[in-house]
Amino acid sequence: MQYLGGDRQRYVRKTRSWNYSIKLEGAMEHNLKDIDVTFPLGVLTVVTGVSGSGKSSLVGDILYPALYRHINQTGSAPGTFRGLSGSLDRITQVEYVDQNPIGKSSRSNAVTYLKVYDDIRKLLSDQQYARMNGFTPSHFSFNIDGGRCPECQGEGFVKIGMQFMADVSMVCESCGGMRFKPEILEVRYKGMNIDDILNLSVEEAISFFGSQDDPVAKRIAERLQPLVDVGLSYIKLGQSSSTLSGGESQRIKLAYFLSMNDSASKSKPQRILFIFDEPTTGLHFYDVEKLLKSFDALLAKGHSIIVVEHNPDVIRAADWIIDLGPEAGDEGGNVVFAGTPSDLMACDASYTSRYLR
């Protein structure tokens, strides 16, 4: 209501300029009409247009695979285009941050993806009871044998095959869904065992670990903060990747890049071009604001961002807009507008312009 009634101030766009750009020439995949498109670097570029106007063809089918091949000398063939030029040396890596699951196994979760679980396992293995019993960090892993429940292999549930229906997941009777052997669950840090910790929300975990004097605990709290920054304070540390929505998986990937240690790459700075496809899907106004602030943090590190998006708040926050259309299908595939959000307002040919007014 605060947003709808205008009582809460929306995100205020930062003004950014750029000195470098790349140019995609002769894009002709699907309905694209042999177009030349310039993408500025070091800023937020938003690609807009009605559904079917050619946005995904331009960014996902041509630009991303073409850049990936240029940088890595391998990869799938891009869609039809004539050339890629400009400040290509200003990009060391290209990342397509999609909504696919964060791990191949259902045991994958946010803390394993962000590598925070290594510190949690170390913290527990350093406790007196663990040392007395010879428990190492590997005993607190649910990916290998040792401390995990042998019945469910660290899943917390078992799948029951149904002959004529989809398999049914049942809580493991052996561990009661706690994933680990009883002796491992006896190890406690400040009264909490591994199951208790994995059932904390991100917000609860930051409060718990951040209040401790132990430097490892404080590091855990710090490394969890990016999940809050992308609007995921509510998810459980041990929540299976199979239960996360596509949008949540995408934001965990964003949190991973926000958590990357800059000091490790000072000798050879990383300049990553991030590509997002409709990252605001399912987000509340407040979460969109957090997403934009996360984009700001990536840009402040010297990276570049291209977003395919319909959300008006994201479009208004752009430094550069590329509007495709004017219609969908055969009537689309042209660059209707390329410029700043303020200049877009004067473009009568753009449906996006009319939508934002």
Predicted regions: what is each one?
Residues 1-357:
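Conserved phosphate-binding elements of NTP-dependent enzyme cores
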